Amino acid sequence: MSTVVTIPRSVSWKGDAIAVLNQTKLPHSTEYKTLTTIEEVWKSIVMLEVRGAPAIGIVAAFGLALASKKYTTLHIEEFQKKFNRDCNYLGTSRPTAVNLFWAIDRMRESIQEITTIKEAQKILEEEALRIQQEDEAVCRSIGEHALTCFKDGDNILTICNAGSIATARYGTALAPFYIGKEKGVRLHAYACETRPVLQGGRLTTWELKQAGIDVTLITDNTAAHAIQTKEINAIIVGADRIVANGDTANKIGTMNLAILAKYFDIPFYVAAPLSTFDITKQTGAEIVIEERDETEVTKIFGKQVAPVGTTVYNPAFDVTPNKLITGIITEKGIICGDYKREIVSLFEKTS
């Protein structure tokens, strides 16, 4: 029997504005912030009000559609110049999230043949909506494929938030929990809190509880003990960038879990859409890793917890080598084994 599941959304298009779920306010309050300029979109991405690679791509696409509406009186050449400037500007917001650049490129390519600004504005709005709609379908498909990896009653560990609020809907790593709930397959999530800004503790627990899905929160340094004592059956994570050989950039701490999975001999899955793949890069060594402000580590909710002046290293992501990954779950199926060959083959089939 199917069950209706409450699945929150993070981005909505209002025609002349974008409404984003302000994820920095969760779980204490559910606030939607209205964005009306390209600068507000950029800041919202940088400040993690909207986050998750697919959601970042979606809000960037809407941001470009929104910005185009302010250029109605320009000549077409000047419009193109300002639009390209906006594309480059948004690209500086989160350099590791490949979906951001994928969405920007799609928006840029969609108006290559336009002859009027009115035509461009219409096409850009339609393309942004299409990106959002496609992502929802893609995430559901990822969830369907991922669910085949698990059985009723499984305990599954995850990190950060690769859920509905990080995408158009359903999420990637959390998609099988939603699809499982719909189909009566009970999956229990163990969520790492995910320092330094606690996306697991604040966001994953919040959205799964909204849907009535069992979730247990653990500190990041409890992961090994939890696997050892709580009968964790598998680990599933999202991705911010996957390169041609399968090396995967995701939230800092992901590689720790992959190493633990190898040691304890449990499956380690990556769930991501094809738009998260960057096959222009051959190995993870080529991925640019964003480093964030030291205050994310030295302060917790505004309170200083380390001596002032302490040196901080705060990378937002790490890169998990392909040899630690059991399978990469995409909307087209599950890739495993020879990742380089399988990824090339997958993109040849979809091109």
From Swiss-Prot:
One of its GO terms (molecular function) is S-methyl-5-thioribose-1-phosphate isomerase activity. InterPro entries: IF-2B-related (IPR000649), IF-M1Pi (IPR005251), IF_2B-like_C (IPR042529), Initiation_fac_2B_a/b/d (IPR011559), M1Pi_N (IPR027363), NagB/RpiA_transferase-like (IPR037171). GO terms for biological process: L-methionine salvage from methylthioadenosine. It comes from the Bacteria. Pathway: Amino-acid biosynthesis; L-methionine biosynthesis via salvage pathway; L-methionine from S-methyl-5-thio-alpha-D-ribose 1-phosphate: step 1/6. Substrate binds at R51, G52, A53, R94, Q199, N250, K251. The active site is at D240 (proton donor). The record marks C160 as: Transition state stabilizer. It catalyses: 5-(methylsulfanyl)-alpha-D-ribose 1-phosphate = 5-(methylsulfanyl)-D-ribulose 1-phosphate. Gene3D superfamilies: translation initiation factor eif-2b, domain 1 (1.20.120.420), Translation initiation factor eif-2b, domain 2 (3.40.50.10470). Keywords: Amino-acid biosynthesis, Isomerase, Methionine biosynthesis. Pfam families: IF-2B. Its EC number is 5.3.1.23. Homodimer. Catalyzes the interconversion of methylthioribose-1-phosphate (MTR-1-P) into methylthioribulose-1-phosphate (MTRu-1-P). NCBIfam families: eIF-2B_rel, PRK05720.1, salvage_mtnA. Belongs to the EIF-2B alpha/beta/delta subunits family. MtnA subfamily. This is Methylthioribose-1-phosphate isomerase. The lineage of its organism: Bacteria, Bacillati, Bacillota, Bacilli, Bacillales.
